[in-house]
Amino acid sequence: MDKKLLEILVCPLCKGKLLFKKQELICKFDRLAFPVRDDIPVMLEQEARLIPLEEKDKL
């Protein structure tokens, strides 16, 4: 993922900073993981995966 793009992208819900990990953009605050498909972030809430509490602690 392009570092410049990662610097300007934020969570669409809380506007918090995102972490790029394993083809997902992760918002620790909302516990959501947004998929990145073909280097294009899919920043739709309905496409996001809810991160279980156990997994969030490992981020």
Swiss-Prot record:
The lineage of its organism: Bacteria, Pseudomonadati, Pseudomonadota, Gammaproteobacteria, Legionellales. It comes from the Bacteria. SUPFAM superfamilies: Trm112p-like. InterPro entries: Trm112-like (IPR005651). Pfam families: Trm112p (PF03966). GO terms for cellular component: cytosol. Transmembrane segments: none annotated. This is UPF0434 protein lpg1920. Belongs to the UPF0434 family.
